[in-house]
Structure formats: C-alpha cells, structure tokens
C-alpha cells in the first residue's frame, strides 16, 4: 500500500467536474494530516495549475517553482481556493515529489485565509 504524506505532490484525475471546478489530470498537494492519510481513503488536496501573472496576484494562490524534489516541470500555482476531497484509491495517478516545509507554511497560510481560521480572513 502506498503511504501518502502531507506535502506530497501527486497527480490526480479530477474529472468529472461541475461548473468552475478544476479538472483534468493534474498535480495536487496533499494537505490532510498524516493520521488521516494513513487511515482513510479520502484525503484533501489543493490542485496545482500553470502560473500566470493574474493568478500570481491572488492572495490564496501559492507560487511553486519546479525542482527535482517536488517533481514539477514548470512554474505553477497551488490554488488553495479549489481545495477538494478525493478518494486516492480511485483518483491517484502517480506521485511526483514533495514540497518543502517553508512552502507548506505558505499553503497553510493561504488555507487559513480561505477558511477564515485563526482570525485570518480576506
């Protein structure tokens, strides 16, 4: 059995979608804690999409530069507003790599804004 960990970047099949949801097979960052990742098939992920100047100005988007450790091949954005649950047994395509602790702190901050946790809001 694959051990998925918080901060991993995995390719996920996000289809089918409805409305403005992010779709296709694309990289996603695992944001659930490792206790859940080990015990339940449904995990929470943040989709990763191609970087653009417009997307880069959105507070809840986190810029990610490609590296050997994260497995990305181009400058990207973690779109924390598009966070969604997936059943990894059905949707996982492959594991790419892992983000640094510093980058995960940026994603955590963006998620706190999205969900208004700890008094941080828009």
Protein language model regions, located:
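Conserved functional hotspots at enzyme active or ligand-binding sites that engage polyanionic ligands
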Residues: 1-122
């Amino acid at each position: 059995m694959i051990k998925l960990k918080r901060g991993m970047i995995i390719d996920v099949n996000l289809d089918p979608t409805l409305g403005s949801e992010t779709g296709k097979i694309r990289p996603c960052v695992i944001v659930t804690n490792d206790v859940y990742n080990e015990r339940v098939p449904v995990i929470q992920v943040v989709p990763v999409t191609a970087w653009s100047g417009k997307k880069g100005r959105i507070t809840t988007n986190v810029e990610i530069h490609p590296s050997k450790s994260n497995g990305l091949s181009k400058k990207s954005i973690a779109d924390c507003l598009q966070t969604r649950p997936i059943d990894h047994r059905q949707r996982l395509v492959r594991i790419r790599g892992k983000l640094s602790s510093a980058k995960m702190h940026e994603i955590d901050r963006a998620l706190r804004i999205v969900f208004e946790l700890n008094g941080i809001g828009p």
